Each structure stands twice: as C-alpha cells, then as structure tokens.
Amino acid sequence: MSNISVKNLSVHYDGYCALKSVDFEAGKGEFVAIVGKSGSGKTTFLHALARFVEFSGDISVPKNVGMVFQHYAVFPWFTASENIAFGLENETKEKRAQIVSEHLKLAELEDKKDKYPAELSGGQVQRIALARSLAHNPEVLLMDEPYGALDAYTRDKMQQWLLDIWTTHKKTIVFVTHNIEEAIFLADRVLVLNDQKFVGEYKISFARPRHESIKFSLEFNKLRQQIFESLNHTNN
C-alpha cells in the first residue's frame, strides 16, 4: 500500500529545471533513501513533497508530514523542552507536558531538558530536531541530510538511534543523503537521483536489526560500487 505517490513531478526555478518528470512511490512504514550529488534535486524533491515549492504533476502525501532539515532547525532561544513543545499549543497543558516528556526520553535527553542548543552537541541538537518532528505524530517523516555536519562517530550513533526509532514507530521515512554507506545501512530501498531524475533503484536485503559489521561485507561493498557507478553515470 503506497503512503506516498508521485507522478510526473517537475519543478522549475526561474527557467531552471530542478526536477523533470519524476515518478516515486513509498509504502506505508517503508524507509527509502535518496542519494545524489549536490544540485541533483534531492532537497527540491523533499520540498515538493512538503509542498514548500510550486510544481507540476501529481503528489499524494498524507496531511501530517514531519521534516528534519539539513541544518539544525531548532530555535536557539528555546530550551530543549521548549523546542519539542513548539507547535503543540492546541494541546492541553497536561497533554503537552506529557508529549514533551515522552519525546525527551525518546531523544535520550531528559537530563538536558533545560539546556539551550548552544549548550548541546551537534548530535544532541539533531535529536531534538527529530524529537520535535515526531512529537506531532506524523505519518511521513522527510529528512534532508540530517547527519551531514556530524563527525563519523556521532553520525554512526545517530544512524543506529534512528533505526531504533523507526523499528518502534514504523513511520514512512524519505531520507536524503550524499553518503552511499549511510543510505544502504538505513534503508529498505535506495534511489539514485542524477540530472534531476531518478536513474537507479536498489532493494536492500540486509536483515533487521542491522549492525555496523554489515558495512564490511562483500554484498554491502558490491552495492556501494553499483550505486556509486549509477551516481556518476552521465548521459552523453
């Protein structure tokens, strides 16, 4: 059952074609990763799904969509608790406090609830950003290179944390990254975006839960090479 359906999607900016005639589907609870070079249209695709940009074509997405941006999209003048509470104004005070408490626990930051973003590490700030998106109980979560600015150790920890959350909550996730290893490790499917259109699709068959050790397997490295070649293929 498709939770996201895109048909013949095109996006233009002042005469520039950012996406051209793109088709896409994601099943309910599926984790789909999209890889592509800078300027290939990855972020534009997410923005179209979230209806942040004008487009032509057909997009069917549930109304309740959460988004985690490429750069830390948290309010620096709000504490961790206040950031998670943002947008929950229609809830009762008691319900809002319950949601915030649950998502601080989910983010493993209960002891940092009164800290401001400047007092937290990059990984902690990104956990707050994800917890805030999840606090609204979205059916679909769009993630735009959320770990691109993190060091390798923190990124690996965040990948495992995200998989733990996905396993528990089974949200439909569309995850954009330039990191092929990250895409293979996280996703059920990896799509390659090149020259403003999808040029490759790879089913990831590694059993879940996944462990870092799969990154050293022959199958993993074969997939990585195939995706790399697709990513760097040019039509002459």
Residue ranges and their predicted role:
Residues 141-144:
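Catalytic Walker B motif of ABC-type/P-loop ATPase nucleotide-binding domains
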Residues 94-112, 164:
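Conserved ABC ATPase "signature" region
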Residues 130:
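Hydrophobic anchor residue at the start of the ABC signature
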Residues 50:
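Helix-to-loop junction immediately C-terminal to a conserved catalytic motif
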Residues 78-85:
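Short coil-to-helix segment of the ABC ATPase nucleotide-binding domain corresponding to the Q-loop/switch region
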Residues 115-118, 136:
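Conserved signature/switch motifs of ABC ATPase nucleotide-binding domains
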Residues 35-37:
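The feature captures the beta-strand-to-loop junction immediately N-terminal to the Walker
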